[in-house]
Amino acid sequence: MARPSVCLLASLSALLLGIAAVSRSKGLRGTESQREPRIPSQFSQEQRIAMKEALKGAIQIPTVSFSPKELNTTALAEFGEYIRKVFPTVFHTSFIRHEVVGNYSHLFTIKGSDPSMQPYILLAHIDVVPAPDKGWDVPPFSGLERDGFIYGRGTLDNKNYLMAILQALELLLIRNYIPRRSFFIALGHDEEISGINGAQKISALLQARGVQLAFVVDEGSFILDGFIPYLKKPFAMVSVSEKGAINLMLQVNTTTGHSSAPPKETSIGILAAAVSRLEQTPMPNMFGSGPLMTAVEQLANEFPFPTNIVLNNLWLFRPLVSRLMERNYITNSLVRTTTALTMFNAGVKVNVIPPVAEAIINFRLHPAQTVQEVLKLAKDIVADDRIQFHVLDAFDPLPISPSDDQALGYQLLRQTIHSVFPEVNIVAPGTCIGNTDSRHYLNLTTGIYRFNPIYLQPQDFSSIHGINEKISVQAYETQVKFVFEFIQNGDTDEETVPHLHEL
């Protein structure tokens, strides 16, 4: 996930949207809709060893994206050869077409037997963020296994999901699986630097071919364990939206000179004051805008006392709830556009007044705001004509995808979660606070869902784009199992039947 883009953290959305003791819903027709017997998601010991070794090998290839102009293209090319070697059946099946897009991204077209069924697409990305050796218990690109965990950059973001998709398909194919519903697999090579040459080009290619997708599934949320107070059981969050983003450069130009006779204000001082004002003046709290307010009102009775009383009377307690959400950096990101100073550059020598100072601010936009609204607010907060504003890149928040009974992609995820993780009773829609490749597919579908089928605990979160990123062997095997079942569930008819689901 890009920059630091773990979608996990619409946890409050999940809390508010998902804690229900009894949920009245509709579910997809299950086995009765399948025209062929299901292939059981059971793997031999030999297959389980092979799948973990395949992941280790993928981690050992340092497919790092440093910047849009600096990628490890040698590693990206090597990775393409690696997946050909590890998943030979995928590359040599007659109804699968493989294409390289943008030099290093990969598009697989898996042709189903029923052309009347609308196809879907599974997304993952090849590239990873840099990983300096310092602080790691093992080298970050070693793929070493220790105490049941595989360590390395990409084990959670996002080679685990990429390899699980291809591994599951490989295992299905060797058991003579032929899908009813066509689907695509798109592996982008530059997601960590916005996906312009990978996902964007794949999307454009599909659009040129007239493809319209039933839904998209990408990385994003997780099964969250231990994130929500008073919630002892884990819950699954499927992100149905994604925040927007602005990378804004603030620049100050002044006259240079010798430090022995400094001016009253230097470029650094002027810029530092402006940045400080932005940090000390958060964007407005938007609690009450969008679906979050409605979710709180609908689910208030599912919370223990006294929370249920507070949430049932938002006409009175709304300011209190808003303030409480601001106290935690996770929930704060759900109620407002966040402001993060990520880069500051100035100075050429210790005794020279710097002529230029630059800072880059990363805004993550609340779904109720637009790029233009946030830029105007930022200019009003800075309130200094000496500060130049340069928008490096920006995009508005993504639309909210449906999560109702007729939303095929969401219901397929929900069905598969309950099958593979029977201990997880709660599946809730949420918002992705990071940015993913899925935003490039808006022109192909209205259903975009972000879910990574593994457990995540608070201590795991900091390792994503951080130190000692790792995944348990068991978790990876379960991830393969999830994709294995999801692909088969995708062959189900789009009809739905009502049922009462007790949690």
Swiss-Prot record:
This is N-fatty-acyl-amino acid synthase/hydrolase PM20D1. Lipoproteins are powerful coactivators of PM20D1 activity in vitro and NAA biosynthesis in vivo. CDD domains: M20_yscS (cd05674). Residues 1-25 form the signal peptide. It catalyses: an N-acyl-L-amino acid + H2O = an L-alpha-amino acid + a carboxylate; an N-acyl-aromatic L-alpha-amino acid + H2O = an aromatic L-alpha-amino acid + a carboxylate; N-(5Z,8Z,11Z,14Z)-eicosatetraenoyl-glycine + H2O = (5Z,8Z,11Z,14Z)-eicosatetraenoate + glycine; N-hexadecanoyl-L-phenylalanine + H2O = hexadecanoate + L-phenylalanine. Zn(2+) 1 binds at residues 157, 192, 465. Binds 2 Zn(2+) ions per subunit. Its EC number is 3.5.1.114, 3.5.1.14. Keywords: Glycoprotein, Hydrolase, Lipid metabolism, Lyase, Metal-binding, Protease, Secreted, Signal, Zinc. Belongs to the peptidase M20A family. It is found in: Secreted. GO terms for cellular component: extracellular space. Secreted enzyme that regulates the endogenous N-fatty acyl amino acid (NAAs) tissue and circulating levels by functioning as a bidirectional NAA synthase/hydrolase. It condenses free fatty acids and free amino acids to generate NAAs and bidirectionally catalyzes the reverse hydrolysis reaction. Some of these NAAs stimulate oxidative metabolism via mitochondrial uncoupling, increasing energy expenditure in a UPC1-independent manner. Thereby, this secreted protein may indirectly regulate whole body energy expenditure. The active site is at 127, 191 (proton acceptor). It comes from the Eukaryota. Zn(2+) 2 binds at residues 125, 157, 218. InterPro entries: Bact_exopeptidase_dim_dom, Pept_M20A, Peptidase_M20, Peptidase_M20_dimer.
